């Protein structure tokens, strides 16, 4: 798109619009809030957290001024605790289960307290956990999102030589590229990646697992110089300094490593299968969000009127960010009713406060070249039984209708079993139908929260260690997710299960 279809706002205003919606606590605020906690025995909040963080434990350490100890409790159960402090749906997890919510209708602000402690740790040079004594075993991890980072962190603590293969220029997966910037700045995800790298985990970015290959040493050498130069300047490697994408074959991956963990997430955005889907001005929501994450505001494509298709949390991220970039009108179109939307209620309320319009029970049937000054027109049909046809004039259409499962990758390349919904089949230890291959995250659960993926990465690390060493180890919060929790996650991941 040209500059005419980019944000009309000045950079200062955009920066204000994208400031974190939940501000950091001051030390005084954190102290007061921490002292409200009842420090429950067998705390409901701890059970409600998929990674089972010892919530009363870390809050009590905040109250006593031991922030390093508090952060250690958090990262012991969840290696991406700073990310989850920002993006977790705490209203339906830990804070939703808080006893104070029942008593006073005001739960302890667990998410903000967790952020307070983890931000302290990320801003402090003191390492929380160190790499374990080398045990001579090697593990390859495909994907550097929440599940991959979590698994790598625990394996490093156990002394494994861990290499993460990531196809994007930067590590962090969805946390780095797919979270709304006003919820979580990209810098937070990259800081957690850096902490895990300091534990000896190697990150081979711009590296895709495919059919041809080069050795790990050759692959690592191709990015080593750029990373070394960046390290000297104490900065994140700019995208333009990272070499072009290289391909590593899955067969060689299996030869190089004693175990492989697949944490590749989901694939491309689902196709709508309607006329006009490939017109200029039609874009995938994840592409739109990824562009915003660069914070190069004036290069982000934007229409004056934006139509977003879908009603999941990704759709909410798209509509709110389009509005905050300066779109004059943003409309969210969904084929079902508001109560059927998979987005959380508080996410919908945020979009409403931002001035987003909603059209419920309307299915897109085509995208047309626009008339009367509009670049496009979204043609819809009512799904309320009336079959009424209408058009939404717009300059941009954003598709947020879920992502495809990577069936070909798992069936043809990895050769592991998948279920009828395209999810990798795993046991309680995250082991697949191939005993050497483990899997976790969205590719195994169909699409849930970052915190769910972090827990699966933890369970996989335990499973890999037991499989390779015969030793049973349990990290903090190793309980498997409850049936109720899994069902809730499945509902809110429904946009990816279409």
Placement of each model-derived feature along the sequence:
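Ferredoxin-type iron-sulfur electron-transfer modules and their immediate structural context
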Residues: 1-138, 257, 262-278, 369-373, ...
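Residue-level detector of alpha-helix initiation sites
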Residues: 79, 145-147, 312-314, 444
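A short, basic/flexible loop-to-alpha-helix module at the beginning of a structural domain
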Residues: 120-139, 249, 288-303
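Feature captures the FAD/FMN-dependent oxidoreductase FAD-binding
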Residues: 133, 138-140, 190-274, 366-377, ...
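Phosphate-coordination loops involved in phosphoryl transfer and adenosine-cofactor binding
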Residues: 135-138, 206, 302-306, 361, ...
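N-terminal Rossmann-like FAD-binding beta1-loop-alpha1 element of flavoenzymes
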Residues: 138-163, 315-323
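Rossmann-like dinucleotide-binding cores of NAD(P)H-dependent redox enzymes
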Residues: 164, 168-205, 319-366, 472-488
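FAD-site-proximal beta/loop scaffold in flavoenzymes
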Residues: 278-303, 393-447
């Amino acid at each position: 798109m040209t500059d005419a279809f980019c944000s009309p706002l000045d950079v200062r205003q955009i920066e204000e619009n994208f400031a974190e919606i939940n501000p950091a606590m001051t030390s005084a605020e954190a102290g007061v809030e921490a002292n409200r906690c009842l420090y429950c025995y067998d705390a409901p909040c701890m059970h409600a957290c998929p990674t089972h963080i010892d919530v009363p434990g870390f809050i009590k350490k905040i109250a006593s001024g031991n922030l390093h100890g508090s952060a250690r409790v958090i990262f012991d159960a969840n290696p991406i605790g700073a990310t989850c402090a920002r993006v977790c749906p705490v209203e339906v997890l830990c804070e939703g289960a808080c006893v104070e919510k029942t008593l006073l209708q005001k739960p302890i602000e667990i998410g903000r307290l967790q952020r307070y402690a983890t931000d302290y740790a990320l801003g402090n040079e003191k390492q929380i956990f160190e790499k374990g004594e080398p045990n001579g075993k090697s593990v390859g991890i495909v994907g550097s999102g929440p599940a991959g980072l979590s698994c790598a962190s625990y394996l490093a603590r156990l002394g494994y030589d861990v290499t993460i293969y990531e196809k994007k220029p930067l590590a962090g997966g969805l946390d780095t590229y797919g979270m709304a910037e006003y919820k979580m700045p990209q810098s937070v995800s990259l800081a957690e990646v850096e902490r895990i790298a300091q534990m000896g985990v190697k990150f081979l970015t711009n590296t895709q697992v495919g059919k041809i290959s080069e050795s790990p040493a050759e692959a690592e050498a191709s990015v080593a110089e750029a990373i070394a130069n960046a390290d000297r300047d104490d900065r994140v490697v700019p995208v333009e300094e990272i070499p072009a994408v290289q391909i590593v074959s899955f067969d060689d991956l299996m030869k190089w490593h004693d175990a492989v963990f697949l944490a590749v997430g989901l694939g491309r955005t689902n196709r709508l299968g309607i006329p006009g889907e490939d017109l200029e001005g039609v874009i995938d929501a994840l592409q739109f969000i990824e562009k915003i994450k660069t914070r190069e505001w004036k290069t982000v494509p934007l229409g004056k009127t934006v139509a977003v298709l879908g009603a999941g949390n990704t759709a909410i991220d798209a509509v709110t960010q389009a509005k905050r970039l300066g779109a004059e009108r943003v409309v969210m179109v969904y084929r079902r009713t508001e109560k059927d939307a998979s987005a959380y209620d508080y996410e919908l309320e945020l979009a409403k406060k931002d001035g987003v319009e909603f059209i419920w029970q309307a299915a897109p049937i085509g995208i047309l070249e626009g008339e009367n000054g509009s670049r496009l027109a979204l043609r819809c049909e009512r799904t309320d039984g009336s079959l009424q046809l209408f058009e939404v004039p717009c300059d941009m259409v954003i598709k947020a209708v879920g992502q495809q499962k990577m069936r070909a990758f798992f069936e043809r390349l990895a050769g592991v079993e998948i279920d009828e919904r395209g999810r990798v089949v795993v046991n309680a230890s995250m082991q697949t139908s191939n005993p050497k291959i483990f899997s976790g995250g969205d590719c195994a659960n169909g699409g849930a929260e970052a915190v769910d993926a972090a827990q699966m990465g933890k369970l996989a690390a335990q499973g890999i260690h037991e499989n390779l060493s015969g030793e049973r180890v349990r990290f903090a919060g190793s309980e498997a997710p409850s049936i109720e929790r899994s069902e809730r996650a499945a509902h809110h991941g429904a946009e990816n299960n279409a």
